[in-house]
Structure formats: structure tokens, C-alpha cells
């Protein structure tokens, strides 16, 4: 499932078919008012923001990430005129659109939010962008996005096959260009997508084309780093990317580990990093199930590891993350490895 070259019939066929998820599309008068869109700075957040801006072109778009929002860095930008997509819940927003299990407001939070005038749409869709897309599908012109949505879904839900990952098609490359470190570029992307750019127009854009070529070339260097800095401990691939400047999701590490690992833990960031510095963030850890294995997902709830030491950690059971907590990485890693060693009782779903 990948768009490559000039022809992509399989994905185009998939994209023309609306997913049946029981989501009731909104009527125009049912859409909550918003003037600002705050989205995660990954592929899912990008497409979620594009959908929301396609419906309301005059809305401004900002990109952030989960740790920044939970750390209070986005508070000044969140009010009842703000829609949050693909980010943790914030009670001050006006409309909340998400699909992460650990982000879902509990009953008390949801009731207080609704009583204060907020609107919540939380569903366990493959991506938050898919939820936004289905909600606005009947009142927004989005045919240009339709063929790309299956890749957005697959990337965010662990649905990329190993063959597709190794092929590294243009949309997979595009996903690696998404970053909170370059808000100008992210704004360029969302303007293209919200403005009607289809796959061909997107990939023909000089800025996008150059970024995709750059990450394509960089992948070999990241692969070498993974090979040199990953160990497998009791079927958990532990990859140290901290202090390197490199970043990766779980696909690259689990592809390297193959059938030797059921999951991976990737350490990113810097020991002296700061949450407000996108170029030098603090130490964090991400946990991913090996989705390339048959039945590799849904065996263990990795979000329990992400929330064990960091109350602001979380995500999905198969893909999640957290910040490293005092006294430091070594102690945190010891705790996570102990949980993993007892996974059949501590993490088993």
C-alpha cells in the first residue's frame, strides 16, 4: 500500500472507498466554531489540520507536539475558538478531535468540558485525520485528499507492510519531512493540502520535492545509526538515538530487528535538552510494537510503560511515548526493562 512514481492504482482504488466506521458526518451548522487549528506536527496532524482548514480556510494553523502541550507551552494559544487535532486533551479548547487511547477525556472531564461549551469527538479511528475527514466529508471538498488518506491511516496505526516500508514511497518520505522544528515548512504543506493540491501537485512542489529527496538521502545514515546503536534485550529492541540529532519511528528499528523483537524502545533527545527548544528537546522514549510480525500488534499495552513514570506520557497501546524522568535514563530504562521482563502479567492485553 504505497504511492510510487506516477501510477498508484491500488491506493487510488482504496482511497475512493469511504471507510465505514459508524461516524456520523456533521451538518454544516453542527460544526463547532473555530478560528485556530492546533495540530500535532506529524503526518496525521498535518492531514487533520488540512481537513479542518479545507472546511474553514480563514482559520489559522499552528503545529505542536504532545509533550509541549502537556507541558503548558501552548496554553496561550488554546481557547474556545481553538480546535485540537491529534494532540492530548486540553479543557480550554472549543473542539477536541482525537483517537489516542490515553488522550481520551474521562467521564468527569468530558462532562465538565461539555458543560463549559466544548465539543468532543473521540473515536478509535486509524488516524485523527481520518476522524476529521469523516466528520466533514459531506460538507467539504476533499476529493484531492481521498487517495492519500489510506497511507495516513496506515502510518499512524501500524498498518504499513515491511515491503511498503522498504520501498519507501513518496508519502512515506513526506511523513519524515513533517517536524515541529520547521513551522514555516509545515505551514507550506498545510496550505498546499487545504488549498486543493492532490498527490501529483504536492510531490511536484519544489519545496516538498527537495525535502523528500533530503530525507530519502538521510535514511541510509539513520539506518547505519540504528544498526550500530541498537541492542535486543529479551525480544525488546532498544535503540539509542539520544545525543545524535537523529529521529525515527518504530518502523525502521523493527524492520532491522526482524523476528528477533516483539517491540522496540527508541530513546531520543538530549540530556541537557529543553522542551521549548525544538532543535534540542529533552530525553524521551518511544515504544512501538513490531507491526511487521504476524499478530505483532495488540499483544501488549505498551502505553503502560509510557505512563509508568511520566504522568504526561501516553499514546496508543502499540505506539506511545514519554519523557525521561528523574533520576535519569538509566533508572528509567531499568524500570521499563523490568516491566518488559514481566510483560505476560504487567503488559498483556
Enumerate the predicted regions with their spans:
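Accessory alpha-helical/coil subdomains and C-terminal extensions
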Residues: 162-221
Amino acid at each position: 500500500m504505497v504511492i510510487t512514481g506516477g501510477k498508484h492504482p491500488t491506493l487510488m482504488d482504496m482511497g475512493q472507498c469511504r471507510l465505514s466506521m459508524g461516524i456520523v458526518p456533521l451538518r454544516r451548522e453542527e460544526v463547532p466554531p473555530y478560528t485556530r487549528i492546533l495540530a500535532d506536527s506529524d503526518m496525521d496532524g498535518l492531514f487533520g489540520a488540512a481537513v479542518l482548514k479545507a472546511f474553514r480556510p480563514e482559520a489559522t494553523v499552528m503545529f505542536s507536539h504532545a509533550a509541549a502541550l502537556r507541558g503548558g507551552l501552548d496554553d496561550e494559544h488554546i481557547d474556545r475558538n481553538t480546535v485540537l487535532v491529534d494532540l492530548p486533551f486540553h479543557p480550554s479548547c472549543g473542539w477536541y478531535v482525537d483517537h489516542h487511547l490515553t488522550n481520551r477525556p474521562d467521564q468527569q472531564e468530558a462532562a465538565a468540558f461539555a458543560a463549559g461549551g466544548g465539543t468532543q469527538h473521540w473515536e478509535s479511528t486509524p488516524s485523527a485525520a481520518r476522524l476529521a475527514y469523516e466528520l466533514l466529508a459531506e460538507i467539504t471538498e476533499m476529493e484531492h485528499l481521498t487517495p492519500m488518506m489510506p497511507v495516513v491511516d496506515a502510518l499512524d496505526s501500524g498498518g504499513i507492510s515491511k515491503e511498503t516500508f522498504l520501498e519507501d514511497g513518496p508519502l512515506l518520505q513526506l511523513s519524515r519531512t513533517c517536524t515541529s522544528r520547521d513551522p514555516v515548512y509545515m505551514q507550506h504543506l498545510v496550505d498546499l493540502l487545504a488549498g486543493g493540491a492532490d498527490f501529483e501537485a504536492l510531490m511536484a512542489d519544489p519545496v516538498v520535492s527537495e525535502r523528500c529527496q533530503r530525507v530519502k538521502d538521510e535514511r541510509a545514515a539513520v539506518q547505519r545509526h540504528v544498526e550500530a546503536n541498537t541492542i535486543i534485550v529479551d525480544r525488546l529492541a532498544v535503540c539509542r538515538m539520544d545525543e545524535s540529532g537523529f529521529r525515527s519511528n518504530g518502523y525502521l528499528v523493527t524492520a532491522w530487528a526482524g523476528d528477533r523483537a516483539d517491540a522496540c524502545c527508541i530513546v531520543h533527545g538530549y540530556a541537557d535538552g529543553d522542551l521549548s527548544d525544538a532543535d534540542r528537546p529533552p530525553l524521551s522514549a518511544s515504544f512501538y510494537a513490531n507491526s511487521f510480525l504476524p499478530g505483532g500488534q495488540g499483544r501488549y499495552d505498551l502505553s503502560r510503560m509510557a505512563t509508568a513514570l511520566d504522568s504526561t506520557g501516553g499514546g496508543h497501546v502499540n505506539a506511545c511515548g514519554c519523557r525521561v524522568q528523574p533520576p535519569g535514563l538509566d533508572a528509567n530504562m531499568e524500570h521499563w526493562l523490568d516491566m518488559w521482563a514481566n510483560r505476560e502479567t504487567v503488559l498483556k492485553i
